[in-house]
A protein has these predicted regions:
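A short, surface-exposed loop/turn module that caps and links secondary-structure elements
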Residues: 29-54
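Enriched for short, Lys/Arg-rich terminal
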Residues: 2-7, 11, 18-22, 55-61, ...
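N-terminal first-folded block
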Residues: 8-38
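Solvent-exposed, charged interface segments at domain starts and junctions
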Residues: 1-2, 38
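A periodicity- and composition-biased signal for non-globular, repetitive helical segments
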Residues: 11, 27, 33, 49-50, ...
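Short, surface-exposed linear patches
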Residues: 25-27, 45-47, 75-78
Length: 81
């Protein structure tokens, strides 16, 4: 699988603390090897739009779509508690 990032994601990502960015890259590596990796807790977020949610850590989630052989990373946001 390949990875593509939206401009929206890139804007949000650049504003995040470095520690969160590093955690995201670790989680992205898990996603590329196994979408069912327990650390990701990946699940369908919006069935109609084909949007998935996965965990960065306790505080952040990232959202993506699967388009052909590409994970399109849509956004990364603080998880509301």
């Amino acid at each position: 699988m390949k990875v593509a990032r939206t401009p929206h994601f890139l804007r949000n990502f650049s504003d995040l603390p470095t520690v969160v960015q590093k955690k995201f890259y670790k989680q992205l590596a898990y996603l590329l090897t196994d979408i069912r990796h327990p650390s990701l807790r990946a699940k369908k977020y919006d069935e109609n739009a084909g949007i998935w949610q996965a965990r960065v850590d306790n505080d952040f989630r990232f959202y993506f779509q699967i388009v052909d052989d590409t994970y399109l990373i849509l956004s990364i946001i603080k998880h509301p508690k």
